[in-house]
UniProtKB/Swiss-Prot annotation:
EC number: 3.5.1.5
Gene that specifies this protein: ureC
Quaternary state and interactors: Heterotrimer of UreA (gamma), UreB (beta) and UreC (alpha) subunits. Three heterotrimers associate to form the active enzyme.
Species for this entry: Rhodopseudomonas palustris (strain BisB5)
Binding-site residues for Ni(2+) 1, renumbered to this chain: 136, 138, 219, 362
InterPro entries per the UniProt record, alphabetical: Amidohydro-rel, Metal-dep_hydrolase_composite, Metal_Hydrolase, Urease_alpha_N_dom, Urease_alpha_subunit, Urease_AS, Urease_asu, Urease_asu_c
Primary localization: cytoplasm
GO terms for cellular component: cytoplasm
Keyword Metal-binding included in the entry's annotation: yes
PANTHER family: UREASE
Superkingdom of this protein's organism: Bacteria
Names of required cofactors: Ni cation
Name recorded for this polypeptide: Urease subunit alpha
Binding-site residues for Ni(2+) 2, renumbered to this chain: 219, 248, 274
Pathway field: Nitrogen metabolism; urea degradation; CO(2) and NH(3) from urea (urease route): step 1/1
Amino acid sequence: MSVKISRSVYADMFGPTTGDRVRLADTDLIIEVEKDFTTYGEEVKFGGGKVIRDGMGQSQVTNKDGAADTVITNALIVDHWGIVKADVAIKAGMISAIGKAGNPDIQPGVDIIIGPGTDVIAGEGKILTAGGFDSHIHFICPQQIEHALMSGVTTMLGGGTGPSHGTFATTCTPGPWHIGRMIQSFDAFPVNLGISGKGNAALPGALIEMVEGGACALKLHEDWGTTPAAIDNCLTVADDHDVQVMIHSDTLNESGFVEDTIKAFKGRTIHAFHTEGAGGGHAPDIIKVAGLENVLPSSTNPTRPFTRNTIDEHLDMLMVCHHLDPSIAEDLAFAESRIRKETIAAEDILHDLGALSMMSSDSQAMGRLGEVIIRTWQTADKMKKQRGSLSQDSARNDNFRVKRYIAKYTINPAIAHGVSKLIGSVETGKMADLVLWSPAFFGVKPDCIVKAGMIVAAPMGDPNASIPTPQPVHYQPMFGAYGRALTASSVVFTSQAAAAGHLARDLGIAKALYPVSNVRGGISKKSMIHNDATPNIEVDPETYEVRADGELLTCAPAEVLPMAQRYFMY
């Protein structure tokens, strides 16, 4: 017997379905469900008097014979490839299926089997995304990692050794000894981690030593001397070992101008950090590289989006992070040369055009690692308010814009750093690094963070209460963040040379090493999903005005942002 119910009642019970629209947090961004993989009348839902019970939605199939370990039911998946409603199966820590869950003995169209050995995470009315990937981390303190995780970031890549002055300023872990000690420390943290070695050297020996010692990338930073010779040598070593190179170029233009740096690239693939330039790079025109085919450009989040406070806060940040003295005129001039409202405004628009491909933090070194996701969506919202709907979107929804922006902190950094076969999207065969959000809190405060199929963090009420919801509610690590479950549910990214050797044995680590691959000639700007635009970018050296294909890129700073004080006390 069938019964008709209204869309609103259906959405309240099973979550939105095809054609329903959902607002993201308190932004103006609206998504519309493109497809529903579940079957009307055969939806599965857990709870008293609900469907997932023995002989009903739960079959007798064992896990060995194909039942899922976990099913996330009726979730609204938001990813670069689509915005769809589906059940998601997790098996052995990997996403094993996206489709319709249930009991195939009595239900039609079941491609995810629920058995006695299957747990359930209720996704009704929730949004499901891939865990975030922050590819610009200064490992200044270990407490960063918990803050990032609680924001929805499950993978972090960067450099450093702790609160040394080299780490305060540069995203580099120098030398195999430091790299080894950092990798040993990674056994304590329930996220995927990777180390970038110092790439500043004119001869290859020391760089090869770091790559073989466990670095999964090399970082060129101006504070260590990003000369054309160092750039060329670093890229040569990277080509030989299939690791990525990230660059923070020469703000002072001492060893050359942006054209000299581009020449040193020799057309080779490189990840350009804080491409706008406030975080560092040839003043005033490093932003030009965002239009090159071989450059994978990213932003750091303190300039995201351009607001009335952006300029003022940057000078103090820069002084602290780069060991500058405000009483020295040259240091002050160095700082002021990097902070330009014209290029920061253009950065907003270049993100909206898909010319800037990735978002990252620059953690504690002119960036806030707990705000990568928030600031991505604040930028998207600001651009919708100021520029209207994208041509690829309809009047009903912002689906393409949302796919463009979510790719900036999920799949694109995974592609850029050679790990997209394992992480970066909600797709079968990938590690189940997933984040559930209530739509009203999307991008701000996750409901649940899953790492390799196990809940690793969530908001949790008073542990002494009779139910899990009473105040005070805090984000807390869960069982997936402890013991051997932690090391079994996350990996360390390394070079192929390190993974093929005896590094894991020599360091005595419990986490698996995962070798990065296909980060050199096999990828380019065209590999950046929804963010592959290559406009010709020009910067006026006197006014700092930015033009893309001849069009002036400018916008007003935001006075008010969504996803801000409505959600936080401070």
